[in-house]
């Protein structure tokens, strides 16, 4: 499956109302110790505390009404399960 730039833009537009825009941060001490500029995308500030909400919301929002009648299920006890539970609730 090839993912296009348009696919990414469409996914972004779909999930935007349901997620936080999380910050990108850096740490001067780490940068100085390593000689490299590190940047951290802080998805721990996301609504469920993980980036998995992005995929869970996108997958759920692309289902048809017919598919949604069957419900949503996953085999996970972690962040993916939290993401799908959040998506199903919303």
Locations of regions flagged by a protein language model:
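PLP-dependent amino-acid enzyme catalytic core
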Residues: 1-90
């Amino acid at each position: 499956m090839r993912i296009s730039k348009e696919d990414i833009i469409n996914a972004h537009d779909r999930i935007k109302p349901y997620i936080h825009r999380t910050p990108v941060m850096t740490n001067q001490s780490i940068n100085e110790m390593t000689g490299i500029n590190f940047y951290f995308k802080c998805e721990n500030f996301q609504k469920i505390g993980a980036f998995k909400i992005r995929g869970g919301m996108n997958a759920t929002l692309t289902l048809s009404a017919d598919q949604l009648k069957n419900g949503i299920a996953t085999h996970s006890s972690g962040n993916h399960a939290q993401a799908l539970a959040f998506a199903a609730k919303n």
